[in-house]
C-alpha cells in the first residue's frame, strides 16, 4: 500500500468536498477546483476526512494511489490558503511592468516580452524587479512561474536573468588573463 496514499486527509470546516462518478469537486473560501480521477482509484468522504483507496492492485493503480491523494490534498490547501511563487529579476535595465492581464518584461533584448496571464492566476509586482505569482491551483501557479522564468534563465557568470527567490545559482569564474 502507498505510504502517502493511505493517509487520510482532514477536511477543514470551510471546505466542501463532493465526489461524483470520477470527479472530485473541492469548494472553499478562495474558489472551486475539479479533479478527474482514474477508474482504478476510489475516493470516499467519511467522518470529516477524505480516504483515497484503490480498486485494483496492479502497478499503475499503486502509482496513482499516492498521486491522487497528493492532488486532493493540494486542492484542499489551495482553496483554503492558496499557493504562491516569488521571482526576482536581476540585471541592469531588466524590469517588469503590468498592464491589465499582461506582463511586459524588458530582459536585455531589443524588444519587450509580453506574457499574458492565464485565468485562475494573479501576478503582483513589488517594484519592477519582484514578481509574485498567486492562485489556488498549485500546478497553474508553478507553470506560470516556470514560463516567466524560462524567458531569461539566470546565467552562471553574472547571475543576470529571472530566478526563483529561494533558488541558488551556481556561479562560474570567468576567464582570467595570463600575465606575461
From Swiss-Prot:
One Pfam family hit: Ribosomal_L6
One GO MF term: rRNA binding
Cited InterPro entries: Ribosomal_uL6-like, Ribosomal_uL6-like_a/b-dom_sf, Ribosomal_uL6_a/b-dom, Ribosomal_uL6_bac-type, Ribosomal_uL6_CS
Name of this chain's protein: Large ribosomal subunit protein uL6
Gene Ontology BP, a term: cytoplasmic translation
Protein role: This protein binds to the 23S rRNA, and is important in its secondary structure. It is located near the subunit interface in the base of the L7/L12 stalk, and near the tRNA binding site of the peptidyltransferase center.
Organism: Borreliella afzelii (strain PKo) (Borrelia afzelii)
Subunit structure: Part of the 50S ribosomal subunit.
UniProt key word Chloroplast: no
S-S pairs: none
Amino acid at each position: 500500500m502507498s505510504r502517502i496514499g493511505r493517509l487520510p486527509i482532514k477536511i477543514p470546516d470551510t471546505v466542501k468536498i463532493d465526489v461524483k462518478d470520477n470527479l472530485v469537486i473541492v469548494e472553499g473560501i478562495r474558489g472551486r477546483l475539479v479533479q478527474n480521477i482514474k477508474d482504478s482509484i476510489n475516493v470516499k468522504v467519511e467522518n470529516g476526512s477524505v480516504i483515497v483507496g484503490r480498486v485494483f492492485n496492479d502497478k499503475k493503480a499503486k502509482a496513482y494511489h499516492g498521486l491522487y491523494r497528493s492532488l486532493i490534498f493540494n486542492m484542499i490547501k489551495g482553496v483554503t490558503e492558496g499557493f504562491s511563487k516569488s521571482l526576482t529579476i536581476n540585471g541592469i535595465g531588466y524590469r517588469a511592468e503590468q498592464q491589465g492581464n499582461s506582463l511586459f518584461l524588458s530582459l536585455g533584448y531589443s524588444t519587450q516580452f509580453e506574457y499574458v496571464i492565464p485565468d485562475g492566476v494573479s501576478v503582483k509586482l513589488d517594484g519592477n524587479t519582484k514578481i509574485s505569482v498567486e492562485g489556488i491551483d498549485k500546478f497553474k501557479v508553478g507553470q506560470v512561474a516556470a514560463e516567466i522564468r524560462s524567458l531569461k534563465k539566470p546565467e552562471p557568470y553574472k547571475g543576470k536573468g529571472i530566478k526563483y527567490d529561494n533558488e541558488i545559482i551556481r556561479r562560474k569564474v570567468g576567464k582570467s588573463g595570463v600575465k606575461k
